[in-house]
């Protein structure tokens, strides 16, 4: 069974998990978290994030040693999955060799599983390749893993590697490309189609980002590009008769996908053709456990349906330009606030996509969660940026395929400070939002205005809206 729920390590929570030794999760706590996601919450997959994070490479060994009774009943690699996100050497040169180490670690994890289960079971048999933009990047990882496995046949002095060190298993792995940029999302189906022609796998998984596209191009553009990709992937699946299972990376705020325990129905209706939905840290730890379990069960009880059909509207480009103009205006405030947003995971040095993006003049900004948290904390939710570039008629066109757009905008408008937006230089946005006559959470906005001035309680605001960023 292909997973419906992928637990991830995205640090968007304001609450500290009950099992954590520190507010900043890492190492041993993340081993516990993986078990908690499987055993208590009912997730059927855990992403293990080697891309820019300090994670434990002995995760399989530790899970099997610490929780043997659970993993004898629930087989790791069959009933539940552990899926690493690896660095992409094309983009992340400093972390490039970690890709090779992670691929070698897959075979080591299989050795631990063989000892534990008494048979060949691959606890890890797929990897997620972030920032994928071409067929070549996917093929390189595929070929590199093959070389790792073929090392077994090499002669070392007076013996072979296989005789000395043992077999390398599994023989093949699946590569899950993660498409994050506008260009990559728009050509994702084409890239996957080329890959399927060469490989003809039993099935293929595809990961579509929601947070970074929203940060780079705005909420409405991100939803548009992801939905366009989902439609083309569905058509490719019908054309090739090879099952293609999309994963969508969704976080708590509408800006990052709206995946909260109290909003799963909307997410399911918004992305009906998606097979696997991410549940990030806020989903897992900022809500009562009963609500979280119920929400996970709800998703797992449903099946994929046909996606919405759409053509990317021409006016989206104008919206993007205005969104990026407003981000530039807010950049000093975002950077100032980001230093006050608490860290929730141990991270290595990492440059987000915005750092590489030429269309914003190389503007250096924090990653999506702190970006979102910073803007919510001053009462300017990022969902609303660029909205003044669209007419009511254009929003109606978008609502034909982005079915929850008005609900998402209404959610964000509750936390909007007209005063802060005006002071920051977003007069046109202020005038446009007034037309919606939003119901404002006055207590929230009052605190956000204090935060904008340099004081105030950022965690209190996160609790009021239901997520950190």
Curated annotation (Swiss-Prot):
Pfam family for this entry, one: PEPcase_2
Q: Which EC number(s) does the record attach to this protein?
A: 4.1.1.31
UniProt keyword annotations, A-Z = Carbon dioxide fixation, Lyase, Magnesium
In Gene Ontology terms, what is a biological process of this protein? oxaloacetate metabolic process
GO MF annotation list: magnesium ion binding; phosphoenolpyruvate carboxylase activity
Domain of life per record: Archaea
Task: Give the cofactors, semicolon-separated.
Answer: Mg(2+)
Enzymatic reactions: oxaloacetate + phosphate = phosphoenolpyruvate + hydrogencarbonate
What is the uppermost EC class here? lyase
Q: What job does this protein perform?
A: Catalyzes the irreversible beta-carboxylation of phosphoenolpyruvate (PEP) to form oxaloacetate (OAA), a four-carbon dicarboxylic acid source for the tricarboxylic acid cycle.
Assembly and partners? Homotetramer.
Family listed: Belongs to the PEPCase type 2 family.
Q: What is this protein called?
A: Phosphoenolpyruvate carboxylase
Annotated organism of origin: Pyrococcus abyssi (strain GE5 / Orsay)
Taxonomic lineage: Archaea, Methanobacteriati, Methanobacteriota, Thermococci, Thermococcales
**Gene for this chain:** ppcA
């Amino acid at each position: 069974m292909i997973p419906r729920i992928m637990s991830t390590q995205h640090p968007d929570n304001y609450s500290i998990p009950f099992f954590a030794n520190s507010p900043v999760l890492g190492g041993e706590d993340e081993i516990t978290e993986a078990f908690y996601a499987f055993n208590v919450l009912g997730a059927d997959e855990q992403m293990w994030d080697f891309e820019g994070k300090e994670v434990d490479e002995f995760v399989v060994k530790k899970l099997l040693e610490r929780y043997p009774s659970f993993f004898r009943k629930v087989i790791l690699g069959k009933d539940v999955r552990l899926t690493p996100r690896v660095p992409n050497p094309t983009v992340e040169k400093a972390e490039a060799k970690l890709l090779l180490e992670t691929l070698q670690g897959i075979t080591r994890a299989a050795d631990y599983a063989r000892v534990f289960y008494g048979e060949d079971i691959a606890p890890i048999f797929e990897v997620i390749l972030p920032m994928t933009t071409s067929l070549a990047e996917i093929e390189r990882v595929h070929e590199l893993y093959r070389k790792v496995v073929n090392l077994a046949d090499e002669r070392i002095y007076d013996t072979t590697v296989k005789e000395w060190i043992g077999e390398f298993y599994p023989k093949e792995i699946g590569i899950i490309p993660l498409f994050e940029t506008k260009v990559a999302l728009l050509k994702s189906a084409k890239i996957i189609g080329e890959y399927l022609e060469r490989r003809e796998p039993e099935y293929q998984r595809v990961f579509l980002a929601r947070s970074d596209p929203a940060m780079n191009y705005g909420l409405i553009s991100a939803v548009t590009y992801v939905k366009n990709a989902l439609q083309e992937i569905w058509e490719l699946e019908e054309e090739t008769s090879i099952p293609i299972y999309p994963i969508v990376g969704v976080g708590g705020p509408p800006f990052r996908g709206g995946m909260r325990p109290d909003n799963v129905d909307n997410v399911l209706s918004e992305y009906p053709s998606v097979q696997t939905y991410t549940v990030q840290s806020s989903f897992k730890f900022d809500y009562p456990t009963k609500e979280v379990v119920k929400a996970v069960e709800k998703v797992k009880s449903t099946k994929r349906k046909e996606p919405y059909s759409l053509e990317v509207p021409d006016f989206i480009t104008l919206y993007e330009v205005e969104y990026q103009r407003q981000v530039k205006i807010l950049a000093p405030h975002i950077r100032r606030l980001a230093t006050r947003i608490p860290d929730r995971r141990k991270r290595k040095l990492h440059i987000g996509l915005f750092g590489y993006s030429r269309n914003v003049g190389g503007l250096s900004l924090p990653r999506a969660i702190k970006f979102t948290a910073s803007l919510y904390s001053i009462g300017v939710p990022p969902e609303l940026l660029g909205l003044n570039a669209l007419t009511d008629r254009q929003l109606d066109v978008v609502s034909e395929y982005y079915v929850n757009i008005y609900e998402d905008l209404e959610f964000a408008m509750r936390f909007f400070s007209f005063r802060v937006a005006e002071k920051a230089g977003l007069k046109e946005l202020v005038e446009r939002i007034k037309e919606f006559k939003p119901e404002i959470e006055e207590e929230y906005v009052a605190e956000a205005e204090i935060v904008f001035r340099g004081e105030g309680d950022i965690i209190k605001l996160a609790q009021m809206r239901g997520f950190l960023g």
